[in-house]
């Protein structure tokens, strides 16, 4: 632990952040493979690829809710663990990790029961047609039964990164993704299981990742260990974790509501082909958002530790570096989406009608994504500094206050309602990024002057 303190508190800020960011970004990119490799293979199944891809895409709102509950714990607990470690309170840090593990197990039991029973009704609500519902159900029911592994991987892995073991955290995702990539073609095509094979491959790979995490957090190499005597939930531990994680939870759960809004509106105005295009666009957009989250995930321990230690200049340097990386990446990604949307769409499907539809709609949807890096960098920095309330408000701004209403309003104001649905995204991206960035810079110095509260 002393070595971790010395590195976080006195080493080169940029070097430290890169050491943590690179594995975190790699882990997020590899994690992206969990989400898109299935879709790439499914989209190329002969004869049913487009319908099967659309059906699996309709499972996205449930998938996002599962991820949201995992990150309610992981994104809330990891910064508090780092702050406690920076304050020299190892006992409290281990209580946070152990309580968080218990909460993830409880969430997984409840969510499995609720989503498995409600899947048929929910998928219809999301816009499933008679042609796409069988594929949506086949995939979702298997995935839901393995949701405990999903929650453990997503919820506990941040506790490895926040201790400075970024490479170990990266390996968690890499191992699972490699297994998924190997199993997908075997189960989907070799054994002829189709979408069921894709779901089985994902669940098995997540199970291996969960075992890897638990072995590390109970082993000798970790600084902070999972402890049986600390697993009984304590209100004074859990509530602060939930309070800080709620902003990420809102961001991810509103992604679910957002996905429902897009799918239902596009099903109404454009039919299955529009919903299928949205599935491809959503997958492509993760190529932007997940690496940014990896950058912020790598920057969080450095910011949180030095904030807890009262080293303001290092916190400022860490934020500037994080903002620069996020902003540059999203601008480059925007350029790619404007120049070659058809090539990106072709990765996910061989259906020419779906590729053509996706090409023009992707340009509209991605028109404001260059601003996303600034919004996420500032919003995640609020979290790293323990500012739960303002982080939550900013998480609500883009999706709840701006985007979801625009999805339903713009189709009535424009001659082409489908164009209006897709246009809602860039309008809200640019407005939200502007407001979030201004808010952060107006509060940043004041937060640093007040310092971190005792965890």
Predicted regions: what they are:
Residues 1-23, 81-148, 190-245, 303-368, ...:
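Short alpha-helical transmembrane segments in multi-pass integral membrane proteins
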Residues 8-48, 61-76, 80, 105-112, ...:
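N-terminal transmembrane alpha-helices
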Residues 19-38, 142, 176, 205-209, ...:
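Transmembrane helical elements of multi-pass membrane transporters/channels
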Residues 22, 38, 77, 118-119, ...:
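Hydrophobic/aromatic residues in alpha-helical transmembrane segments
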Residues 29, 33-54, 123-130, 186-193, ...:
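Helix-terminus/linker motif at the lipid-water interface of multi-pass membrane proteins
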Residues 50-61, 136, 140, 199, ...:
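Small-residue hotspots at the loop-to-helix junctions and early N-terminal turns
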Residues 53-113, 150-169, 263, 277-335, ...:
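Small-residue-rich hydrophobic transmembrane alpha-helices
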Residues 74, 143-161, 169-177, 198-211, ...:
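Short runs within selected transmembrane alpha-helices of multi-pass transporters and secretion channels
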């Amino acid at each position: 632990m002393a070595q971790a303190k010395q590195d976080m508190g006195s080493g080169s800020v940029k070097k430290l952040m890169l050491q943590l960011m690179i594995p975190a970004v790699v882990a997020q990119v590899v994690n992206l493979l969990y989400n898109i490799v299935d879709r790439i293979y499914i989209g190329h199944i002969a004869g049913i690829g487009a319908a099967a891809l659309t059906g699996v895409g309709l499972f996205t709102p449930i998938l996002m809710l599962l991820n949201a509950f995992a990150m309610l714990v992981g994104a809330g607990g990891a910064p508090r663990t780092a702050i406690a470690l920076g304050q020299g309170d190892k006992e409290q840090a281990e209580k946070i990790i152990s309580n968080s593990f218990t909460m993830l197990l409880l969430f997984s039991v409840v969510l499995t029961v609720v989503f498995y029973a409600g899947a048929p009704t929910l998928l219809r609500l999301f816009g499933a047609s008679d042609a796409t519902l069988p594929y949506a159900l086949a995939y979702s029911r298997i995935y839901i039964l393995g949701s405990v592994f999903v929650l453990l991987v997503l919820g506990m892995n941040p506790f490895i990164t926040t201790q400075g073991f970024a490479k170990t955290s990266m390996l968690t995702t890499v191992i699972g993704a490699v297994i998924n990539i190997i199993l997908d073609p075997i189960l989907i095509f070799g054994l002829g299981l189709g979408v069921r094979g894709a779901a089985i491959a994902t669940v098995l790979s997540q199970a291996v990742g969960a075992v890897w995490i638990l072995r590390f957090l109970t082993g000798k190499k970790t600084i902070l260990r999972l402890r049986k005597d600390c697993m009984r939930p304590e209100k004074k531990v859990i509530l602060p974790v939930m309070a800080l994680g709620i902003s990420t939870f809102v961001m991810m759960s509103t992604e679910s509501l957002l996905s429902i809004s897009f799918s239902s509106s596009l099903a109404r105005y454009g039919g299955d082909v529009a919903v299928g295009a949205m599935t491809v666009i959503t997958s492509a957009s993760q190529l932007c958002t997940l690496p940014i989250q990896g950058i912020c995930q790598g920057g969080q321990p450095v910011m949180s530790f030095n904030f807890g230690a009262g080293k303001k200049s290092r916190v400022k340097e860490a934020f500037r570096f994080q903002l620069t990386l996020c902003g540059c990446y999203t601008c480059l990604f925007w350029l790619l989406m404007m120049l070659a949307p058809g090539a990106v769409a072709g990765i996910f499907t061989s259906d020419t009608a779906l590729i053509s539809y996706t090409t023009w709609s992707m340009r509209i949807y991605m028109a404001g994504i260059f601003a996303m890096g600034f919004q996420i960098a500032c919003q995640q920095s609020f979290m790293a500094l323990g500012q739960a309330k303002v982080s939550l408000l900013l998480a609500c701004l883009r999706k709840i206050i701006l985007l979801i209403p625009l999805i339903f309003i713009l189709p009535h104001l424009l001659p082409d309602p489908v164009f209006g649905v897709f246009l809602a995204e860039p309008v809200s991206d640019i407005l939200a990024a502007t407001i979030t960035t201004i808010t952060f810079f107006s509060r940043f110095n004041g937060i640093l002057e007040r310092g971190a509260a005792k965890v």
